[in-house]
């Protein structure tokens, strides 16, 4: 289980993102902006205060869930098969070497962008169902940050508020406080 070189230039990262956007049907501009916000286009970025890592700063559980569920569609079946979901819903990789390899894939620009596209596509479907419309890119980013359920609650907050439609960023600020 080898991980490709993470020392790639911004044009190579942008190329990986463009390919992921085309393959997953996700907006290139959205994936590019999210990578810029999350990691400054650095595939090897690691958050100092959480398990978040890689181009899109996936936390461990979100990464494992995304690889488990979407990985087989993108040639990552061997990795997906190594991931198990426990009765508590948490994902784990019992084999330490396999876990290291799977978590290392977050630092591969091509794999990370592909999984971000699949994750975004899934979030968009869940949000469309919850909101009754196509989600905005701001709502998709809230889903990247809080998960689709959290972003769906953001839509509910906006709908049930003072009648004024708040932006997704206003909702995040209010929620975090």
Language-model segments: which ranges?
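Active-site-surrounding "flap" and adjacent substrate/cofactor-binding loops of secreted or lumenal enzymes
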Residues: 52-65
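Extracytoplasmic
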Residues: 26-29, 53, 135-137
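Alpha-helical segment that forms one wall of the substrate-binding/catalytic cleft
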Residues: 64-134, 139, 145-153
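Short, solvent-exposed loop/turn and secondary-structure capping segments
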Residues: 45-47, 68-69, 154-157
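Catalytic and substrate-binding regions of cell-wall glycan-acting enzymes that process beta-1,4-linked
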Residues: 136-177
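Export/targeting segments at the very N-terminus of extracytoplasmic proteins
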Residues: 1-41, 106, 110-114, 118-131
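Extracytosolic helix-loop segments that constitute the early lumenal/periplasmic catalytic or substrate-binding loops
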Residues: 41-42, 71
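Alpha-helical, low-charge segments enriched in small hydrophobic residues
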Residues: 36, 50-51
């Amino acid at each position: 289980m080898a991980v490709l070189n993470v020392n790639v230039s911004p044009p190579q990262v942008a190329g990986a993102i463009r390919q992921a956007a085309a393959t997953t049907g996700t907006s290139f501009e959205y994936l590019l902006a999210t990578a810029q916000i999350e990691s400054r286009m650095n595939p090897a970025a690691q958050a100092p205060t959480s398990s978040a890592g890689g181009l899109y700063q996936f936390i461990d559980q979100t990464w494992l869930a995304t690889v488990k569920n979407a990985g087989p569609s993108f040639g990552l079946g061997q990795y997906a098969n190594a991931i198990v979901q426990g009765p508590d819903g948490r994902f784990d990789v019992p084999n330490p070497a396999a876990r290291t390899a799977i978590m290392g894939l977050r630092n591969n620009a091509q794999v990370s962008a592909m999984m971000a596209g699949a994750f975004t596509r899934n979030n968009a479907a869940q949000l469309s169902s919850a909101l009754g419309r196509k989600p905005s890119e701001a709502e998709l980013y809230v889903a990247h940050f809080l998960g689709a359920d959290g972003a769906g609650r953001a839509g509910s907050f906006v709908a049930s508020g003072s009648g004024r439609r708040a932006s997704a960023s206003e909702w995040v600020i209010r929620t975090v406080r």
